[in-house]
Amino acid sequence: MDGHNQNQYQNQNQIQQSQQPPLKKYVTQRRSVDVSSPYINLYYNRRHGLPNLVVEPETSYTIDIMPPNAYRGRDRVINLPSKFTHLSSNKVKHVIPAIQWTPEGRRLVVATYSGEFSLWNASSFTFETLMQAHDSAVTTMKYSHDSDWMISGDADGMIKIWQPNFSMVKEIDAAHTESIRDMAFSSNDSKFVTCSDDNILKIWNFSNGKQERVLSGHHWDVKSCDWHPEMGLIASASKDNLVKLWDPRSGNCISSILKFKHTVLKTRFQPTKGNLLMAISKDKSCRVFDIRYSMKELMCVRDETDYMTLEWHPINESMFTLACYDGSLKHFDLLQNLNEPILTIPYAHDKCITSLSYNPVGHIFATAAKDRTIRFWTRARPIDPNAYDDPTYNNKKINGWFFGINNDINAVREKSEFGAAPPPPATLEPHALPNMNGFINKKPRQEIPGIDSNIKSSTLPGLSI
């Protein structure tokens, strides 16, 4: 009797389920980035001696966009990573203090406070693998110039050396007594420098992992360090409001910059030529110096919020990006405007941005923040209204545009008062400019020392290549 009632109950459930309308499935297409097509176009044009086509502000010109290294002149604005493409996060979310692209640009390495490395694919933005790298929070990591090695540092002061397949080959225990904040390789990868909250910098021999020299002179935590891409010159930034330049051969401080009034958070040499040095501080300022002219200040930009980190563009030597405490991104061009950003993304992240990284090819830009997410940004298609004013990150979520819905391959909305991006003015030279809402600066172009200059870099005494 019980079995008969059970069968009758199951039949009734099946009838009820068959009468219910089927669940509606929302299908979203995952975006992917293919950089091979622009390179095929570039190779074809060079092989047959053809000029590169000028990209006009019209959607059909998308197929004519070249790779980033083809735009080094006035059309360099095309290389701005203004289009939000994808958001990624680990299943178990942690704050992300550092991200770094692999040298070939195919994967993004993400380091977390849990001591893990996770790898994300650069084309489809899919998760690839996860590994436990350190016992404490990974605070920084850096690839060598020859792409054969990677070094990482953690909050316990430990340094680890990795092969490209993430096989650890050496561990330097107690390299510093406090958390390691930054590290950098020398131009020939024979040495690397680290800085820490223990107020000192250390130079290490990469071949044997031995400490060679201690650079002492800062009076508080050393927040950042960088090695000149060509010369024997190290720059460091500290909580004592100073930026110092060091001679790695003697270990002496050769110059100090006293322009800042608060903690200097980050400093970086220009990666292409190394003529310029940029630093940001908690006094809400960003300054660019020319190392060839006694550290002459070329630019000073102030903001209402703190700058947290910075990154130079890998292809265009005059362009760089600043990340702010409120989660916004600001893109600058030294040849366009010295007083304000040429592009601002106000809601790039929900919380403070901790790390930036340009793909070595220059077509993808990755950002990480304390909202525990990684966001990928790419170059915009011509006349795409969402490129510079996307409701995804400008907090104007209209017409149902939000994460997961605007991932269609033809994600171009109708023009409206929110993000209606007009084409460039008729007076502008037709130089392959994509849609720019408030982007064109009509001020006269200003020449900056240190960019496209033939003056040699080795003008500081004792600093030869």
Swiss-Prot record:
Pfam families: WD40 (PF00400). WD repeats lie at residues 133-163, 175-205, 217-247, 259-290, 348-378. The keyword Repeat applies. Residues 454-465 have a biased composition (Polar residues). CDD domains: WD40 (cd00200). Residues 1-26, 417-465 are annotated as: Disordered. GO terms for cellular component: mRNA cleavage and polyadenylation specificity factor complex; nucleus. GO terms for biological process: mRNA 3'-end processing; mRNA processing; termination of RNA polymerase II transcription, poly(A)-coupled. Its main location: nucleus. The keyword Repeat applies. InterPro entries: Pfs2-like, WD40/YVTN_repeat-like_dom_sf, WD40_repeat_dom_sf, WD40_rpt. Keywords: mRNA processing, Nucleus, Repeat, WD repeat. It is found in: Nucleus. Residues 1-20 have a biased composition (Low complexity). Integral and essential component of the cleavage and polyadenylation factor (CPF) complex, which plays a key role in polyadenylation-dependent pre-mRNA 3'-end formation and cooperates with cleavage factors including the CFIA complex and NAB4/CFIB. May bridge the CPF and CFIA complexes. Present with 7810 molecules/cell in log phase SD medium. Component of the cleavage and polyadenylation factor (CPF) complex, which is composed of at least PTI1, SYC1, SSU72, GLC7, MPE1, REF2, PFS2, PTA1, YSH1/BRR5, SWD2, CFT2/YDH1, YTH1, CFT1/YHH1, FIP1 and PAP1. Interacts with YSH1/BRR5, FIP1 and RNA14. This is Polyadenylation factor subunit 2. The lineage of its organism: Eukaryota, Fungi, Dikarya, Ascomycota, Saccharomycotina. The gene is PFS2.
